[in-house]
Regions:
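Compositionally biased terminal segments of proteins
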Residues: 1-144
């Protein structure tokens, strides 16, 4: 992992030259990977199902597909603003000594009227002195 912002910026610059992917997209992807690492270390790793563009990028490679958010479905847990807030605070509080800190900015309903509760969580990632905004849509799985 990186020990300072200069190392991270250098890695992103080199990766951008190699892949042709815009540096901001690479930075966003890096931040989402750091968040996903925390999810995988949390007690909720079996309840949060990754889907969408970030899952595809993980399967086929970032050079084939980039995404600006992490789309998930929740199974086996109550899905309401308060519970989602508690879960996300717990997840982003996991320290894995990677130089990344997360702050929950807000939690909003994605749809006014929907069969299931669904939320968009805006998260600010702090990498040394670099700030990156993220969106983390959460939905309840059908039948749970």
């Amino acid at each position: 992992m990186f020990t300072n912002a200069m190392q991270l910026k250098g890695w992103i610059k080199n990766k951008s030259k190699q892949t042709g992917i815009h540096p901001n997209e690479l930075l966003q992807n890096f931040v989402l990977e750091r968040l996903l690492e925390r999810v995988s270390l949390s007690p909720y790793r079996e309840n949060i199902i990754l889907k969408g563009g970030f899952l595809i990028a993980a399967m086929v490679g970032v050079d084939k597909r980039t995404t600006m958010d992490m789309d998930t479905t929740i199974k086996g847990l109550p899905v309401n603003r308060e519970e989602i807030g508690k879960i996300m605070v717990e997840i982003v509080s996991i320290n894995i000594d990677d130089g990344v800190a997360f702050e929950i900015q807000n939690i909003k309903n994605i749809h006014e009227v929907s069969e299931y509760d669904d939320f968009r969580i805006s998260i600010l990632a702090l990498l040394y002195k670099i700030k990156v905004n993220n969106k983390f849509p959460r939905r309840r799985a059908a039948g749970y």
